[in-house]
Amino acid sequence: MSETGVDIVEGPRVETRAETPTLGIRETVPFRTMLADRDRLLAELIAWLTVHGIEPNGPFFLRLHLVDMAGLMDIEVGVESTATSDERVRPGVIPGGRYALLDYRRTSLPANRLLLKWIRDQGLSVDSHDSGDGEAFACRCEIYLTDPRTERRKKSWVVRLAFLLR
């Protein structure tokens, strides 16, 4: 573990990823409650999948559509799946393209800072823009490589940051 409180498992690196169909629940929430909201939405999505007898095709994720650390965040908790959706759990797509990736354990803020610095240091840029309400991302995800259904201790999760590049 580094002095920043983050345990780097792999990366940073660039990888080309294919488009991925998803199911997810999307909400606008305050930054200060985002992680509690993520946990609530994750529990809701897991319960929905169980009730509908759907086994995900891949890991769960948190997608940040819009980031405003002083205001509201547009977030989505989802999972890779091509199953039928409803009005609450909606279909979506993680776009294909070149992604900057970093796999880590423990704390997300230093991991995000590390990946963003690495992207800049490589002369790359994240596919985002100022929307007037915050920074809007083409795709910025935390992918939970550890299944939250089997490991409840979040500090033990291996998380992959995946930021779509321009």
PLM features per residue range, with description:
Residues M1-R166:
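A solvent-exposed interaction/effector surface
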